[in-house]
Amino acid sequence: MPSRRLILAALGALPAQAWAQAQPPKETLTPESFLRGIYTPYPNQDFKGQPFWQVDRFFAPDLARAIEADMREAKRRGEVPKLDGDPFVDAQDWDIAKLAISVKADGSKAVGLVSFENQGKPTEITLDLVRTGMGWRITDIKAPSGTLSELYKK
């Protein structure tokens, strides 16, 4: 028959074990693998784009809040949001080829350069990244049409 001490020790361990299992996994992605996760599907003809409206998956908190606020306000007014194309390819339509990704990281910040041809036109996108508690996230995107930070200052 188990002793009282053994039963109490086992019961005491249960909450700690349950707590440990409930914690999100530690982010192990590098800034380059984060960007590859975003961009690798784009050359696939059937790919419809990343769900950038799921802002917490991609953007740092300040930019995520600005995008969400704009989407809510646009919906309330029955209008198109400021971000009316795919920010990762700077377009509403795409046919991506010759995708290349490079990253320069410095501690908790990184800059990614993504180049590709979209419908035969060479395009370069620069993404500023920061390491957050959720992993690497985008603080700004600089594209031929402008930057997200400028878009949301208007």
Name every feature range the model reports, one short phrase each.
Residues 37, 41-45, 58-62, 66, ...:
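Structured segments of extracytoplasmic/periplasmic soluble domains
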Residues 3-8:
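N-terminal export leaders
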Residues 9-14:
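Bacterial N-terminal signal peptides
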Residues 17-51:
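Short, low-complexity N-terminal intrinsically disordered segments enriched in polar/charged residues
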Residues 24, 29, 39-40, 56, ...:
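Non-catalytic interaction/Regulatory regions outside core domains
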Residues 60, 64-121:
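Surface-exposed, charged secondary-structure patches
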Residues 105-109, 113, 119-124, 132, ...:
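Low-complexity, intrinsically disordered terminal/linker segments enriched in charged
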